[in-house]
Amino acid sequence: MLDLKAVAADFESFERRLARRGEGAVQALAPVKPLAARRRELNVLLEKQKKEQADANARIRELARTDKGAVEGARASLRALGDEVKKTEAELGEVEAELTRLLMLVPNPPHDSVPDGKDEHDNVVVKTWGEQKAYGFTPKPHWEVGEALGVLEWQQAAKLSGSRFTILKGAAARLERAIVSFFIDVHTSRGYTEILPPYLVTGETMTGTGQLPKFEEDLFKTTNEPPMYLIPTAEVPVTNMHRDEIFEASAMPVSYCAFSPCFRAEAGSAGRDTRGIMRQHQFHKVELVKLSKAEESYAEHEKMLDDACEVLRRLGLHHRVSLLCTGDMGFSSAKTYDIEVWCPGQGAYREISSVSNCEDFQARRIRVRYRGENGKPRLAHTLNGSGVAVGRTIVAILEQCQEADGTVVIPEPLRPYMGGLERIAAETFPRGVER
């Protein structure tokens, strides 16, 4: 959430910065201006009324000594003035509540280093690791590879849960567990503390990281009141862990990694990635979260990006990094890198991680701070990134590591987690006859 005082003091500056995101961001900010002006008027009026109250109280004390007959009339005037103060305070409270509601719908202005653009086609590739492998055959997409091996099952998953769900069997299920353990081991070795968070959170927690109120249609929630929400990413509970806390500067940065299932309604994704496991309602991810000093957050952002890329480098998976343009950034982010892994069976680079610096946008909502050099509490900067998506790592392995005979070579770092298994070969599983 934006700082109301800063917005009110220089509305045009925020308007210009948000215009880089598109007209929608400017429109979201527009209603704030007249309400902020009314808030200023009410604060001035309230200050005037309270001074009049103080003067009236002083006059009553003076009359009690000099003219007791006039005291009752003065008290009646004071009561009327008190009613006016209450009326002004009530309107001010309503205005401030509406301003807070409106600011919850305004996205984070982009950092100056973010390129202007409308959508993903305007993103800028900033680095590449590895090369596209040359195959002596036409590589298949992961859904064909997984189906031929018998380790990815969609028909039974649809019977259980509907579309956008998958059952992993045999070596694929083992591969998923291996990837999670490998990712956590790498990140903890690089200074992250492992967290296993709750998967159901409150509406306040979802609001803290920016999913609510704007993106409720993308979330799954329970039917009880008040509802609980299934997390779309471990960023939500982990970032909120330190809500209403103040850190000493010496404790910063605070670095966490967390494995969790993620649940997303995928509203607006009809017709996209309907085959395979790229876009699921339920998937696993290892998330990286940092709380940083404001002046160090962009250095920490680059470190987090490197940490996310490190797991892919160790697995030998060719990938590239793109700096997202203003039109493709997430709501809470000031700057985002996407890590895109090469999928030869699809002939495309596909996102496997987003690494974002949200500056103080989330911290203002959750009120997480640290003591600056002068000892005064200052809002922390929050950073998050996938380290990385587990299902999409399986996609990359099935496509990049496939062989002409249909088997898939398991990257060496994962083999100790899979009992030394070196490749995935076709498996047969028990199955009855549909009736």
From Swiss-Prot:
The entry's keywords: Aminoacyl-tRNA synthetase, ATP-binding, Cytoplasm, Ligase, Nucleotide-binding, Protein biosynthesis
A GO cellular component annotation in the UniProt record: cytoplasm
Annotated GO biological process: selenocysteine biosynthetic process; seryl-tRNA aminoacylation
InterPro entries to which the protein is assigned, alphabetical: aa-tRNA-synt_IIb (IPR002314), aa-tRNA-synth_II (IPR006195), aa-tRNA-synth_II/BPL/LPL (IPR045864), Ser-tRNA-ligase_type_1 (IPR002317), Ser-tRNA-synth_1_N (IPR015866), SerRS_1_N_sf (IPR042103), SerRS_core (IPR033729), tRNA-bd_arm (IPR010978)
Gene Ontology MF term list: ATP binding; serine-tRNA ligase activity
Pfam families: Seryl_tRNA_N (PF02403), tRNA-synt_2b (PF00587)
Cell wall biogenesis/degradation found in the keyword field: no
Pathway connected to this protein: Aminoacyl-tRNA biosynthesis; selenocysteinyl-tRNA(Sec) biosynthesis; L-seryl-tRNA(Sec) from L-serine and tRNA(Sec): step 1/1
Residues reported in the UniProt entry to bind ATP: R264, A265, E266, E351, I352, S353, S354
Catalytic activity: tRNA(Ser) + L-serine + ATP = L-seryl-tRNA(Ser) + AMP + diphosphate + H(+); tRNA(Sec) + L-serine + ATP = L-seryl-tRNA(Sec) + AMP + diphosphate + H(+)
Entries under PROSITE patterns matching the protein: AA_TRNA_LIGASE_II (PS50862)
Enzyme superclass (EC): ligase
Annotated EC: 6.1.1.11
Localization in the cell: Cytoplasm
Amino-acid positions noted as binding L-serine in the UniProt annotation, renumbered to this chain: T233, A234, E235, E287, S386
Family: Belongs to the class-II aminoacyl-tRNA synthetase family. Type-1 seryl-tRNA synthetase subfamily.
Function, as annotated: Catalyzes the attachment of serine to tRNA(Ser). Is also able to aminoacylate tRNA(Sec) with serine, to form the misacylated tRNA L-seryl-tRNA(Sec), which will be further converted into selenocysteinyl-tRNA(Sec).
NCBIfam families named in the record: serS (TIGR00414)
Protein name: Serine--tRNA ligase
